[in-house]
Amino acid sequence: MRQPLPFVIVVAALSWASLGTAALSQDMVLGAGSTFAYPVLAKWAETYEAGTGVKIDYQAVGSGVGIRQIKSRTVDFGASDGPLRPGELAVAGLMQFPIVFGGVAPVVNLEGIGPGQLRLTGSVLADIYLGRITKWNAEAISELNPGLPLPNQAIIPIHRADASGTTFVLADYLARVSAKWRDEIGVNTAVEFPTGIGGKGNEGVAGFTSRTKGAIGYVEHAYAIRSKLASVSLQNRDGEFVTPSRQAFQSAVANANWAAAPAFYALLAHQSGKQTWPITGATFALIYKQQQRRLTAIEMLKFFDWSYRAGAKLADELQYVPMPKDVVQMIESAWAEVTDARGQPAWMEPTTAKH
């Protein structure tokens, strides 16, 4: 049996300042980016290390930083909830592939209102973040919630202060349901929110929302559960009001056509389906097609392969949606393009890549 390499991979939400020196070591596989996927990446890495002796240092610093770090070769892989377009990937010499799916949940801090009780539409949510709806008992909200005791209280929008894939997923959804959002704000990992308070990472937004009466924020669903925040019920494309759940995310994933997505560039917001959660997204890994460190590249791809297979159950337990088998096959076929500095393939098929 292969003796595991003495890799030092510690999964932690470390500061950006620590990235530079850590990447100098040749004995590490380093990743950085999405806080959206941090709960499942942390669990995967912990479990993978226990079974293989191989560790992974993933730093949850936000998708924007993750993209910058992989482009500057400070890390071995970046993770972003906003995919890069094929042209941008080609210029940088990168490839991307989805690693897990989840949902962005608008969450509120309103006394007496629990998970799923408050109903919102996409256009109303957009108007809240545009600063056009400022009170919780505003007519646009009251009409959606007859009988719900809505307070005459100011709405405090909480948003991301850093470049964020979670923001990208939310903004992409809002641009699809609100012309005002599309024209005034647009879609990016960092947008100019006209109102509200900024928090760093999903943890920061969850924290501000928990501490601020009358607040509304948006976080990955696992953070909403962990922080015991009340998610809203959101109207989907089919006109149904649904709450965030693994099953609702799965419905969105089932409607995505990955075979027709160049460089796996696919967005999952506002998909059809009665049970579909409308703010669903994927986290994408970004890696170089030509790898400078062969052994590191091999171990990195083995980790992702393991996450698709043995890690699927862990993703499910954390309310994420694991990768469908047909998509895994497409992804691992694309890995044939990953080579070392000498042009030799870095990926071995699962039948020969034992874990």
Where are these regions (language model features)?
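N-terminal secretory signal peptides that target proteins for export/translocation
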Residues: 1-5
